[in-house]
């Protein structure tokens, strides 16, 4: 791996390790329409949470067009020294209604956005309290390419959080965040 952990770098946008089910596959292999797809339904509360805080679930989908070559492995470098250029272009989206505005990889995954004054679920609060307080919609556009040790990746994210309570919070009722990352690296196979 040549790059910092993505869930650290794009912390505000990660939906990290949700509990649920998904269907994935590849259609039209090695044709101009070669695509990978993933669709899923999740609890929407993060690591280790099997149940949602209300009756709403998280829905997520990703569609990847393998424009040149095969799908690129989920890695942050071209450690295989790929002999044939590969280029993937993808879009993804997720929607969720819960008391979480962000997630992290630990046992208390459900949390509020860093730096916001959105209300956070109090420790020991009764199950269902503040249930479905936030509506979160987000999307990502991604481009990845590998060729002879060279790895390129670009992600562009947008996330909209709507506070569905009627209280006046210092943080706006609706907030929209944009972010992204670009990575370019080379894995030095000849040195190893």
Write out the residue ranges for each language-model feature:
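Surface-exposed coil loops of outer-membrane beta-barrel proteins
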Residues: 1-64, 71-82, 101-129
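Outer-membrane beta-barrel channels and translocator barrels
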Residues: 28-32, 68-70, 147-150, 189-191
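Short beta-strand-to-coil "C-cap" segments at the C-terminal boundary of structured domains/repeats
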Residues: 65-66, 184
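Outer-membrane beta-barrel pore domains
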Residues: 82-192
């Amino acid at each position: 791996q040549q790059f910092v952990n993505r869930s650290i770098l794009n912390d505000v946008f990660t939906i990290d390790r949700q509990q649920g089910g998904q269907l994935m596959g590849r259609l039209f292999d090695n044709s101009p329409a070669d695509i990978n797809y993933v669709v899923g339904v999740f609890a929407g509360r993060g690591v280790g949470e099997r149940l949602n805080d209300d009756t709403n679930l998280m829905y997520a989908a990703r569609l990847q067009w393998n424009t040149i070559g095969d799908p690129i492995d989920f890695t942050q470098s071209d450690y295989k020294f790929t002999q044939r250029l590969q280029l993937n272009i993808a879009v993804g989206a997720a929607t969720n209604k819960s008391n979480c505005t962000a997630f992290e990889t630990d046992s208390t995954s459900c949390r509020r956005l860093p730096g916001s004054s959105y209300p956070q679920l109090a420790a020991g609060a009764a199950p269902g309290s503040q249930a479905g307080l936030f509506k979160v919609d987000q999307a990502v556009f991604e481009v990845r390419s590998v060729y002879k040790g060279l790895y390129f990746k670009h992600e562009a994210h947008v996330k909209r959080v709507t506070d569905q309570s009627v209280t006046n919070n210092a943080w706006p009722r609706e907030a929209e965040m944009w972010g992204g990352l670009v990575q370019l690296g080379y894995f030095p196979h000849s040195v190893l």
